[in-house]
Structures are given as structure tokens and as C-alpha cells.
Amino acid sequence: MSANASRQQAIQSITNREPTAVEKPELLGKIWAEDVFNLARMEWALSKTAFKAIKKTVHTGEPLDPATADVVAAAMKEWAVSRGVKFFSHIFYPMTNITAEKHDGFIITNSDGGAITDFSGSLLIKGEPDGSSFPNGSLRMTNAARGYTAWDPTSPAYIMQTDNGATLMIPSVFRSWTGEARDKKIPLLRSNAAMNKAAQRVLRLMGETDIATLNSSCGAEQEYFLVDSNFANARPDLLLAGRTLFGAPPAKGQEFDDHYFGAIPTRVQVFMQDYEDQ
């Protein structure tokens, strides 16, 4: 199919598309973090001793003892199961600019052949996937490809809702069997730790004594571009590289006035509302 015919077909598909129905958004206070196992939910679900320990781990990076990890895992599982979740996944961010996951189930069989749900602290803290599919700088042979996911308690677990079900997502880091970082989060956590150490040292030199843990924060990019899927599927550069590699040069003058401060098109507004609800 020629490029012109493909474009004409895309335009026809867009023209014939039925409008998307939009549900009235719920109150923000009702839906905010409803699928997140944050500190507020931990405080409600855990004993005072366990909550104090996990809160200290979240704020200072203090190691969590196995007994407390078991308590946190049990509370996390009960909360997730109560929301219809049967599976959990350690999610991490390898150096491929995409996410990676290792899925497991809460369901195990007992001696009577029945099914029960179980989730221990050891399952929460560490997983054992294969690391051979991820970039490694060619520093090891295939037989040394073992990698480990490790729970990052500084990021709250959350439930990913899809049309095919729900999964408890456990934010994790990914390292090699020798301890090297194999993801993008370990360097970030190490950078935050170094920044916190240096900043606290400066504050103490300035006479400050009551210093909390310092963290960095960043905001999402506010400018984005929406491309209709019919057009995107006809562009190999967008599909493979995620960017425009060929095409007409953009307008550099004031030829258009609908990009800044323009009225929001209906389809764009539908997208924005759906995205914000999620």
C-alpha cells in the first residue's frame, strides 16, 4: 500500500469513528489513591509496632526485619485480595526504556487439594527472574545471567486495573547476582542517598540539628503530542523509534494558532479526562 493510500485510509477510519462516551468523573477525594497501598492504608492495616518499622524503612531506608516483612506482606495481600486481585508482580525498569515484570499468584494448594491464598515476606522482598534478556555490557556469560528483583519500599505497591483483571504491582529494583545495577532505579536511589548525605552535612555546618531525610522530586512533562492510532500505525518511525524521523518540516512561524491557548478538541478532552481519572 502506498503512503498516500495508507494516509487516505487512516483519514477515512478517523472520519467514520464513533464518538467515545465519557462517564461523569467521580469526586477526587473518593478515587485518589484508591488502588495504592500507601502509608495511610498501612497504618490502618498494621499493628503500631509493624507500622512504625515500615514507616522508618520508607523514610530512612532502614532494613526491614523478616518478621515485620511477613506482617506487611500479609496485610498487603489481604488488601489486594479484598479488591479482587489474585496475582502479584514485581515491576522494575531495566535499561531498555520499557518496564519489565515477573508475575506470580497468591493461590497455592494445600494438603487436601484445596486452594488458599498465601504471600510471605520472602516473596515480597525478593524474586528470582532470568537476567539474560536485559542489557549487561557483555560483562558476563549466559550461564551467569541470574538476576534478582528486590522490593523497593520507598515506592508504594498499587493495583493495576485492566479489562482482563487486576494485578498487585510491587515496585522493585533489579540487580545482577554479583550486585551490579541492571535497572534505572538503583542509580536513582543511590543518587538520592548521596544527595541526602551531602545536604545533611551542609545543614549541620549551618547549625541545623533536627534534619529529616532529604529527597528529590520531579514533575511530569506538561507538553505532549497526541497522534491518532491510525496515523501512528502507518508510520514505522513512530512505532519503532518513538519519534519522527522523516516527514515535512514543522511550521516555525505563526502559521497556526491552535497549539497554544487554543480551545481543546473534543477527542483530546476525552483523552485528558480518561488519563486524569487513571
Question: Which ranges hold each PLM region?
Answer:
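Detector for Asparagine
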Residues: 4, 16, 38, 97, ...
